Amino acid sequence: MKTFQLLSFVTKGAQLRYLPNCLRSAEIFTSSLREKLVPEWGSKKHASKRKLLVNTNHLKMDAEIEKQLAPLRARVKEQGDLIRQMKTDGAPEMDVKKLVQELKSRKKELEDMTLKLYPQDFFDRAKMNDLIKRRFFYDNSFAIYGGITGQYDYGPLGCDLVDNMLTEWQKHFVIQERMLKVNCSILTPEPVLKASGHVDKFADYMVKDVKTGECFRLDHLIKQYFEKYIADKKVSQEEKDEISRKINLLDDMTMKEMDDIVKAYDLKSPSTGNNLTDAVEFNLMFPISIGPSGNMAGFLRPETAQGIFVNFKRLLEYNQGKLPFACAQVGNAYRNEISPRSGLLRVREFTMAEIEHFCYPDNKSHTKFNQVADTEMVLYSACAQMDGESPKRMTITEAVRGGLVANETLGYYMARIQQYLLKIGINPKKLRFRQHLGNEMAHYACDCWDAECLTSYGWIECVGCADRSAYDLSQHTKGSGVRMSVERPLKEPKIVDSVVALPDKVAIGKTFKKDAKVVQEALASLSSEAAEDMDKTLNEVGECVVNGFKLTRSMVPAFKREQKKIHVEEIIPSVIEPSFGIGRIFYSLLEHTFRIREDDEKRTYFALPAVVAPIKVSVLPLSNKTEFIPFVTQLADTLTDLNLPLRVDDSTGSIGRRYARTDEIGIPFGITVDFDTVNNLAHTVTLRERNSTEQVRMPIDEVPLIIRHLADGKLQWKEVTEKWPKFVAQETTK
């Protein structure tokens, strides 16, 4: 029996993937391969042939460094094993402590040598993670029960930092672009994700340990093995180049090709050394049963976008039927990752901030493009990647006019994404936009650029900006029978052929009873093309399926054909989607702002911009004497009235240690109430800036508003130092 799907008014060519000008020529050259390209980037048949230039110099360097570090690593491991054995044997605590001291000494020796051998931009992730954990920016979920890989809890500082990032995101995008907003359900019925393609295509390849059942994502397993393999000095350069080529082709490989690699290299479980099962496909969505009967299958949403798409008609109506418009949503999404790793970068539950910009497929210009036209960006095009070239810096206008970026709307959002990331503190030298190759493209995208941040884990995708064409709305039109279209007046009326189903309402009523109305509405909504196809199917097969209901010829005995004049055309809009991974941006921001004081390597801090810093200012009385209390209270109350989160630190520690504590958690400004504040009639205080540690002296009544302006970005610290005298020392000390 043929299944009949509702299909109407799909824009022709809407699913063709965009090709920049540099890929429209017939041939592309790489170091060892001259290949033909077809317009369809998503073709696995052709994509698997591509070769990329691979620079292995960093691999050679790492291998040489590791050779020098190997004896030190062995010494540390030897000491650690000895301590574990001593504890197992119940050795005296004092003896164990002595061994621990020796272990610390060896670890310090290894750490110093590592810093010496690696380039000067070496990042001390261990120190940053120590600060994150001590100050509870975030930690493993359910840690007291051993924790769960791929799940994290945000602490007070982490929550505030994320909230501030999202607040700026709302200002930067939702308010400035006058976007609509929705908040949709996390529990998603299966038909929705079946229509979107997630049920069939949202999967990774997985293998298991044959004895323990431990699961591994196959491409990650192969990559880890290969990277370790080519780090071996005994491996010839020719073999290293061949392995590097295979690493770059992993994303193109089929499940069978990956299975062949496992067998050829006799890969084992990295945890136990046991054999591995054959690969299987694993859908990354969390399945659920909705309701007590368990009959309604569903999933936890893998993205927030689908909630916006299924509400398109209501949003269009709210926007008075006009295009273009954009809708935003912030919320959690869920992906059942096979082997979560790299901290917050690959997790099973994460916050997304997504925008769906709906526009006409034949007009993707943007009215505000001129406002970002001169924005310079580092763009790593698909062409450059395939030719082994470096990313290029250019304006977004050059990229759009040169055909590198598909259209103005896509380019506009890319520029706005960069502005937002730089505003919250992402290092511009560690930010680039990389264009997806065809094999990387999501099943719904026709062009996509990722904003990537360089971290100690490498280049990490933090924001995706995709032209999803008309895919989603077309799919939901088929799946639901509801026309996800917009009407656009024609310049001139035109005559079209019309085909309308004429159902037998009595027969349908007897068969479907309470669902009869739903069936009749579905038949009434058929496009002429869909109705024609249905008539043909009923003639050939005798039955068809509409929206899950099986219909026979007796239920739809006839179809009416006529010509009619139309004054509007129905168009399924295209969608441009910026999608922000908040957790990844959060982690990249912490790495990019992590600092170690030059004069004291033990003093670490986060140089977070004031606009996103969890706490904006600290109030530090130099003494606990009662005469200080009114000034501290005055400052705290005024700062609170100005919506400035603050921390009062009146502990007995030295002022230097208190500065260090507030620096650690990223507080950008500190107000010190000293003896001059109390004793002088002017009642001045000092204001300290975290990064430079510079201090100025100013009247106590003026400092709260100055901090408000500093936090809002309306005032820069340089302007403050130019207006107020630099603080050197107190005039009074008691």
Language-model features, listed with the residues they occupy:
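NTP/phosphate- and nucleic-acid-binding module
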Residues: 2-4, 18, 29, 37, ...
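Long, mixed-charge low-complexity alpha-helical/coiled-coil segments
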Residues: 9-10, 453
